[in-house]
Amino acid sequence: MRLHTLQPAPGAKSTRKRVGRGTSSGHGKTSGFGHKGQKARSGRVGKRGFEGGQTPLYKKLPKIMRFKNYPFKIEYEVVNVEKLNRFDSGTVVDIGTLVDTGLVSSLSAKVKILGQGEITKALQVKVHAISKSAKEKIEAAGGSVEVVD
């Protein structure tokens, strides 16, 4: 062991550098803060997102944190009235029969009947949703409509 090879033990606590104690220390006069300006002042924390007075980036962007309804949106599989003509008169048309004929993909799907086309057969329709025009057309043909949940 020699004086020029001495060093602190691993994990030893080093002493804090004291600033503003003379120019020969390397951290005298301005204490590493530079000259003047916002970052040289006392209490120099700075507001989060502050960009020196110009309009900050988060104000330039659209409001991204506003309420969005997409997690609650109900997706319906659409079947038009004209497609229901393939069933015989008096048939109960529900999700199961629509899946069997391939008009709807699965039993768990929500189904909405829309009023495009004409219907000539009296059917008993049981679906999750139905448009006003579709309901009128089915009832005019002698059928009935029931909305299920």
From Swiss-Prot:
Binds to the 23S rRNA. Keywords: Ribonucleoprotein, Ribosomal protein, RNA-binding, rRNA-binding. The gene is rplO. HAMAP family: Ribosomal_uL15. Residues 1-53 are annotated as: Disordered. It comes from Coprothermobacter proteolyticus (strain ATCC 35245 / DSM 5265 / OCM 4 / BT). GO terms for molecular function: rRNA binding; structural constituent of ribosome. InterPro entries: Ribosomal_uL15, Ribosomal_uL15/eL18, Ribosomal_uL15/eL18_sf, Ribosomal_uL15_bac-type, Ribosomal_uL15_CS. This is Large ribosomal subunit protein uL15. Belongs to the universal ribosomal protein uL15 family.
